[in-house]
Amino acid sequence: MCDDGFDQNWHERNGGNLSYRIKHEEVESVKEELSYDGKWQPVGASVPALSGEYFMVSGSGRFMRNMILEPETNCCIIEVDQTGENYRICWGLVKGGMPTSELPTHLMNHEVKMKATEGRYRVIYHAHPANIIALTFVLPLTDEVFTRELWEMATECP
């Protein structure tokens, strides 16, 4: 997904981030690759509905382009503790670093989305498409105008 976003010019430099709530069977299939020696860190938000969940998360300050080239350096798998208040890195970021600085926001959104969709939706993807950023300089910054302009650009939304 990060590579697709890069190929479509959705990211400037290290802009944007991604988190994926990993399915339980996917966690089981890679358990032997995970380490549980990592220090618990505060999430920065309370997300009790996500207790015990695992997430693949882009690293802070990492380029989306590099996710596919060196995933073990540029992203990580984290586990949320049983209180939903802390996380630890179980895999990745082998050259150091932290998960995205947007981690609290991502996890709060995952918690809401999980409840609202009975767990169907698993990805939070934050991008900085240059063409959308450019529109902020030429359009009035109102929801109505901006949304309408974006809809009109899509051929399937006349």
Predicted regions and their residues:
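Glycine-rich flexible loops
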Residues: 1-158
